[in-house]
C-alpha cells in the first residue's frame, strides 16, 4: 500500500475491539474513529487518542473514512452498512451478516445499487491453513470431493448462560458457532443446496438447542456432515485445534475432514492422504504434510479489506456469500423443526 488505509470501527463490543486491536498493530492500517454510544467505548476511544462518536452517521460525515467495520448487534448490521455504502465507504460487516435472509438480501441489493464493495467477516477464509486447503482442492489433489465432515464440539461453562439471550432462540451454538463451520465448508467445497438436521435440548433443557447435527448436499454432488454441541467435554473444535484465538487451550487433534476420489485432507494439520499407486483399500497410503506460515486471520482479513476498499481485489467473502452461509445455517433450524429437507439452492 502507498499509504495507510483509514479505517473506522462501528460497534466496540468484543469483536469490534478485536478489529481495533489488529488495526492499531498493523503499519498499513490507521484507526480514524470509533462509533458506539456506550461510555466504555468513549473511554476506549479517548485512551487510544482517536475520535469517538455516539452516532455512526456523525463519524461517517466528519471523519470520512476509506472503509468501515460494522460490528454492531446483528439486527442493526444492514441499516448501519447501508449508511456506509450510500456514502461510498467500503464496508466489512461482521457475521452473521443479518438476522434473516431477507435482510441479507437488502445488503446484496444495496451493494449493487451503490457500487461499493462489501466484505463479510467470516474470518476463517483468511486463515493461511484454509487458503492452502482450498488451493489443494482446486488443484485437484483430492480428485472429486465426495465427503466433508466438520466437528464443533466444546463445553461452555454454566456462567456463559447467565445472559438470558443465550438461553433463548437464536442464541445457541448453531447461529453463534456452527455458522463458522458452514461457511468454511462452503469456501472449501462449494455451495450448499440442501440441508437435513436434528437438534436436541436434552442436556440443559433450555429453549435453545445445545446440540445439532446436519447433513449437507453440495452443488457439485458432495455430501457433508456437521456436528455442533456446546455441552460436550471434547477437543474436536476448530477454535481449539487451529489456535486462532489465544483464550482457548490448543489441542493437537483435527476437526475437519475432506475426502475425495484421489485423496483426503485433514484440518487444521493439512495432512494429505493418498495411495502410493493402485487406488484400493488394500493399498498403502502416503501421508504428505503441507506446511504454511501461521498468521492471524483477523489481521489477514483486515489487510484484505484494505485492498478491497482500494478496489485492488474482489472480496473473499461477498455479501451474497454472507447471505448463502446464513441461509444454510438457518436451514439447520428449519430442517430440525420440520423434519424435512430444506432446499437452499439458488433460484433457477
Where do the model's predicted regions map?
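N-terminal Rossmann-like dinucleotide-binding module
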Residues: 1-48
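Beta-loop-alpha module in the N-terminal Rossmann-like domain of NAD(P)-dependent dehydrogenases
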Residues: 19, 37, 50-110
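Short, conserved SAM-binding/catalytic segment
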Residues: 43-50, 110-114
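Hydrophobic residues in well-ordered beta-strands that form the structural core
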Residues: 54, 93, 118-120, 149, ...
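Predominantly a Rossmann-like dinucleotide-binding segment in NAD(P)-dependent oxidoreductases
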Residues: 117, 124-216, 339
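NAD(P)-dinucleotide binding in Rossmann-like oxidoreductases
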Residues: 205-209, 219-300
Amino acid at each position: 500500500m502507498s499509504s495507510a488505509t483509514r479505517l473506522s470501527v462501528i460497534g466496540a463490543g468484543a469483536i469490534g475491539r478485536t478489529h481495533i486491536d489488529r488495526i492499531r498493530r498493523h503499519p498499513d492500517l490507521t484507526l480514524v474513529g470509533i462509533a458506539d454510544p456506550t461510555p466504555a467505548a468513549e473511554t476506549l476511544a479517548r485512551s487510544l487518542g482517536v475520535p469517538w462518536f455516539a452516532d455512526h452517521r456523525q463519524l461517517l460525515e466528519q471523519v470520512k473514512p476509506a472503509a468501515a467495520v460494522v460490528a454492531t448487534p446483528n439486527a442493526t448490521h444492514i441499516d448501519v452498512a447501508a449508511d456506509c455504502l450510500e456514502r461510498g465507504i467500503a464496508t466489512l460487516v461482521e457475521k452473521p451478516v443479518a438476522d434473516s435472509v431477507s435482510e441479507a438480501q437488502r445488503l446484496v441489493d444495496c451493494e449493487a445499487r451503490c457500487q461499493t464493495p462489501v466484505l463479510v467477516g467470516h474470518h476463517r477464509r483468511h486463515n493461511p491453513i484454509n487458503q492452502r486447503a482450498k488451493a489443494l482442492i482446486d488443484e485437484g489433489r483430492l480428485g472429486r470431493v465426495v465427503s466433508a465432515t466438520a466437528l464443533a464440539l466444546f463445553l461452555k461453562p454454566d456462567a456463559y448462560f447467565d445472559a438470558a439471550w443465550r438461553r433463548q432462540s437464536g442464541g445457541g451454538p448453531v447461529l453463534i458457532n456452527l455458522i463458522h463451520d458452514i461457511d468454511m465448508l462452503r469456501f472449501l467445497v462449494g455451495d450448499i443446496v440442501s440441508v437435513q438436521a436434528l437438534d436436541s435440548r436434552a442436556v440443559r433443557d433450555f429453549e435453545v438447542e445445545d446440540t445439532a447435527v446436519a447433513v449437507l448436499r453440495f452443488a457439485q454432488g458432495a455430501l457433508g456432515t456437521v456436528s455442533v454441541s456446546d455441552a460436550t467435554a471434547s477437543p474436536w473444535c476448530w477454535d481449539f485445534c487451529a489456535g486462532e484465538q489465544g483464550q482457548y487451550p490448543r489441542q493437537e487433534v483435527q476437526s475437519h475432514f475432506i475426502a475425495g476420489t484421489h485423496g483426503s485432507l485433514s484440518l487444521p494439520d493439512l495432512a494429505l492422504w493418498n495411495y502410493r499407486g493402485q487406488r484400493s483399500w488394500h493399498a498403502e497410503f502416503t501421508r504428505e504434510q503441507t506446511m504454511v506460515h501461521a498468521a492471524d486471520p483477523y489481521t489477514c482479513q483486515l489487510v484484505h479489506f484494505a485492498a478491497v476498499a482500494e478496489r485492488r481485489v474482489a472480496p473473499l467473502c461477498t455479501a451474497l456469500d454472507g447471505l448463502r452461509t446464513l441461509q444454510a445455517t438457518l436451514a439447520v433450524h428449519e430442517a430440525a423443526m420440520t423434519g424435512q429437507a430444506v432446499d437452499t439452492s439458488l433460484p433457477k
